[in-house]
Amino acid sequence: MPTWGARPASPDRFAVSAEAENKVREQQPHVERIFSVGVSVLPKDCPDNPHIWLQLEGPKENASRAKEYLKGLCSPELQDEIHYPPKLHCIFLGAQGFFLDCLAWSTSAHLVPRAPGSLMISGLTEAFVMAQSRVEELAERLSWDFTPGPSSGASQCTGVLRDFSALLQSPGDAHREALLQLPLAVQEELLSLVQEASSGQGPGALASWEGRSSALLGAQCQGVRAPPSDGRESLDTGSMGPGDCRGARGDTYAVEKEGGKQGGPREMDWGWKELPGEEAWEREVALRPQSVGGGARESAPLKGKALGKEEIALGGGGFCVHREPPGAHGSCHRAAQSRGASLLQRLHNGNASPPRVPSPPPAPEPPWHCGDRGDCGDRGDVGDRGDKQQGMARGRGPQWKRGARGGNLVTGTQRFKEALQDPFTLCLANVPGQPDLRHIVIDGSNVAMVHGLQHYFSSRGIAIAVQYFWDRGHRDITVFVPQWRFSKDAKVRESHFLQKLYSLSLLSLTPSRVMDGKRISSYDDRFMVKLAEETDGIIVSNDQFRDLAEESEKWMAIIRERLLPFTFVGNLFMVPDDPLGRNGPTLDEFLKKPARTQGSSKAQHPSRGFAEHGKQQQGREEEKGSGGIRKTRETERLRRQLLEVFWGQDHKVDFILQREPYCRDINQLSEALLSLNF
């Protein structure tokens, strides 16, 4: 029995309908290729049995995804044909189905491309919804304002273009040009999809694409920044000569492992795996480039210190790697979590288990620009600054020198992942709080997306906000989060914080359900405003709730007077000391419950002191008699007109409109704005 995946696990057996046996056998090679598992249809114990037993052999995660895929294939809970812009059709047909396989790995849904702009999705409910969401995300990114694919005469290309084009080096792909013309936002999402597959143990589809290894190796070589070619830090570079490092330009590589056992399935696992320390670690990988495009050869030797004790020799087309177990270089494993330029982690020719070649795994946004792919040997003019940067970061793992003409671009995704590397523990002290503090209502989705830089749903951000108010003495805290965020979602990070807050009754889930393959969610903003009304609480959100302000005067007052904005500086949660402006109450006053003095309306609403401060009483009685308080639509109209003149001064405009509820004269309001001192 062959060994599937990186680590063998006990077989997983489950039953499906016997009517689906033909489907299973038809899709068996497809499942084995994508999920890197062995699929077996066990013999029936009784011919009349309405079920058949399937057995999966492979790593636990692979088997779990394959099991969900097969269950959805045999008994689909949802099946529908979705539509998307025809421009994206090349994603599902191009690259020999590679991106389609990655999407199947990520969602465990059965995907069948049809006419341009049409995709049939079937599977379990969760898998169907995830696949539909990923396709909708790709369609949405088509309209993002990103620079399109490579253009003629461009002297530099971004890391996204470099990595993406490296995936498309397979000859004879009719959709290659269409893929390269996709917007950068779509290419970035596809690379993120590939990263999800690589962070697990798939897709095994790579092994069936013979031409893909050259492209991926080309991405790896281009991602490695060449050190100064003085021989001080290279690893046996004397035998390199003019070794070729041009996988991204069309060279193909034959990957061989010397001294390995014969037989075994073809496999290519992208995830970085730590092998047991007892194994023999002396391995060799011979990479022999076979030029198909011709041209001058280029060399890009790997940094010796970046690979630990790995000997790299590239001479006469050979590339040998001798390695030590990762236990000797624990920092390499930590560095493998950050995204580098390479998309290939392990290469293997189908004759034995593949050796592990450490190289930086992919990330949604590569941190480097890619300069002209000139001779790697000419890149030795990198200054001392690069050496210092490498030395400072060496403790975190292997660092790669960039080319002298390339830029060093730090991305938001990279910064977010770096912030997640800092440990954080939600620690709510079991001590009494202050009884005079208001109820805190947190907009969980808004807080999580702000901390996740609008790309990830960061559960840590919610936990940090709760920790902040808990430390201030608040004990009445409610976080609202849509219920579907608790299901499997690739955008959610560190969901264990949500579980803990839910167990402490600090988190409430707004209802959501799936009907006909579409997610139906309740409007969580209503829950927040309603709870703030009933508890006289404060809403923590950067949302303006403009759509709810018109529903009632009470809600308008809550949104105007009890909305607390916030921001994050890394993992530091910050709120303003003057939530209603410089002349308004302090944060401590803002968060305290109002003093309930009988007969004093001003005591019931102390925050109105800000609205009453500095009121101009001239003409107020005339305005009251002539028209009364402005309606909401009149206020919004006046606000738009004022912002056309006082652009960017939203806070001042809102203050004047709040202070002058009877005034409808745009000129008087403008004069009042000009007379403000803050």
From Swiss-Prot:
Annotated signal peptide: none
Highest taxon of the lineage: Eukaryota
Quote the biased-composition stretches of kind Basic and acidic residues, using this chain's numbering: 370-388, 610-633
Q: Which Gene3D superfamilies match?
A: 3.40.50.11980
Residues annotated with Phosphoserine modification: 10, 359
Arranged from A to Z, the UniProt key words for this protein are: Phosphoprotein
Q: Which GO terms describe its cellular component?
A: cytoplasmic ribonucleoprotein granule; nucleus
Q: Which family does it belong to?
A: Belongs to the N4BP1 family.
Single GO MF annotation: RNA endonuclease activity
Annotated protein name in UniProt: Protein KHNYN
Which stretches of sequence are listed as region Disordered? 222-251, 347-407, 595-633
Q: Write out the biased-composition intervals (Pro residues).
A: 355-367
* Domain RNase NYN stretches: 437-589
